[in-house]
Amino acid sequence: MQHEAHTHGINMSALGRDKQSLSLEQETVAIEVPGLSLYYGEKQALFDVSMNIPKQRVTAFIGPSGCGKSTLLRTFNRMNDLVDGCRVEGAINLYGNNIYRKGEDVAELRRRVGMVFQKPNPFPKTIYENVVYGLRIQGINKKRVLDEAVEWALKGAALWDEVKDRLHDSALGLSGGQQQRLVIARTIAVEPEVLLLDEPCSALDPISTLKVEELIYELKSKFTIVIVTHNMQQAARVSDYTAFMYMGKLVEFGDTDTLFTNPAKKQTEDYITGRYG
């Protein structure tokens, strides 16, 4: 059954997305989730979620508020460890290694798997010091190395041309959209393998949102990206693959064009056509 007529104006014009047909089975796996459940105390928030996140692609998580998409995202760098009473059952394998095994270096994991949150959170420091923050923590202090990293990361975050003449000004003087791109620069400066974006545009105006979306497309040549978004138009524009979640369960996961135009599950169709959520 075709559902093209029911996408309710969702713009499927991807940001330069490769037009060849995508297939999860043919992708290199970056993150393997072989049956994950998560509890906050007695309350179960994720129910036996299984999926493979492909390397150097953009994967979007969509679903109504409270469906578990941000909770799942935060398992990928163990941010949920910071929540009292949080308990995970199952494994998450990052390039074949279980990140929940005993003795895992969580600080190193969070360097390898960087995260950007909804609200831009630059530090009250200069633009330069924001970008090199993680490098300094690693003990890197040689000026030439830091200078090169700042230019590389700001260019990577499409911010260099806007700030190159004021690197020693406060980051708090930047616009919201610039601050979010600075946070992305700070995150990629330590050269992670995976970027987690938790509704990164929800606090931004449309023009800033477009810049961040274009940036996401550029960054996937270097990083595996997973984005949580409440905006289905955004998921359709920026992602290669989309996962639809509902009440802590993974309902459907596949290439974005197919999921939005010809979903396999009625629950998915009902959500993307606005019947609920």
UniProtKB/Swiss-Prot annotation:
Keyword annotations from UniProtKB, A to Z: ATP-binding, Cell inner membrane, Cell membrane, Membrane, Nucleotide-binding, Phosphate transport, Translocase, Transport
Reactions this protein catalyses: phosphate(out) + ATP + H2O = ADP + 2 phosphate(in) + H(+)
Cellular localisation: Cell inner membrane
RNA-binding in keyword set: no
Membrane topology: Peripheral membrane protein
PROSITE patterns according to UniProt: ABC_TRANSPORTER_1, ABC_TRANSPORTER_2, PSTB
Alphabetized SMART domains for the sequence: AAA
N-terminal signal peptide: none
Coiled coil segments of this chain: none
Binding site for ATP: G63, P64, S65, G66, C67, G68, K69, S70
GO cellular component, one term: plasma membrane
Matching Pfam families: ABC_tran (PF00005)
Subunit structure: The complex is composed of two ATP-binding proteins (PstB), two transmembrane proteins (PstC and PstA) and a solute-binding protein (PstS).
Described purpose of this protein according to its UniProt entry: Part of the ABC transporter complex PstSACB involved in phosphate import. Responsible for energy coupling to the transport system.
NCBIfam families for this protein: 3a0107s01c2 (TIGR00972)
Name of the molecule in the record: Phosphate import ATP-binding protein PstB
Organism lineage string: Bacteria, Pseudomonadati, Pseudomonadota, Gammaproteobacteria, Pseudomonadales
